[in-house]
Amino acid sequence: MTQVRFTVTAGAIIFNNEGKVLLLKHRFRAGSGWGIPGGFLEVGEQPEEAMRRELREEIGLEVDHVEIFTSRSFKKPRQVEILFRCCADAEVKPLTIEVERAEWFSVPELPAGLPKDQRAIIECSIERASACGAKGRD
């Protein structure tokens, strides 16, 4: 029997003390480029480790109050995505060529080009909020 192969990614829905969510504009991402921060797991890496590594590498950000929020799978490409919900309250700036911009957005201000599925996940995350203590999250 042949085992199915797939990639695994880890992403972060990050809120600050004002209840704004952090999005990155990637140069190589389809559409508008805006999306939830994250990336692929490296061999032997746990999902939370990958999420933290990606945030450090791409924008120099450390997060706290980390909790698994949801996971989802895709058929094309074969991929499993694990999303964490966490908090941070820091200025962010791109540290790699692949990230064009990093900005905090309130939900009504989310960029028009943000994929609909990511917009829905952010809205759901606010509804199921817990740890950060900002408006719209507790």
What is each residue range found by the language model?
Residues F6, S32, D64, R78-V80:
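Residue-level preference for beta-strand/loop junctions
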Residues A10-A12, M51, I68, F84-C86:
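A structural signal for short, well-ordered beta-strand segments
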Residues P94-I126:
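NUDIX/MutT-family hydrolases
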Residues N16, K20-E57:
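Conserved Nudix-box catalytic region and its N-terminal flanking loop in Nudix hydrolases
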Residues R72-K93, E103, S125-I126:
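Active-site-adjacent beta-strand/loop module that shapes the phosphate/pyrophosphate-binding cleft
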Residues A120-D138:
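Charged phosphate-binding loop/patch that engages nucleotide di/tri-phosphates or the phosphate backbone
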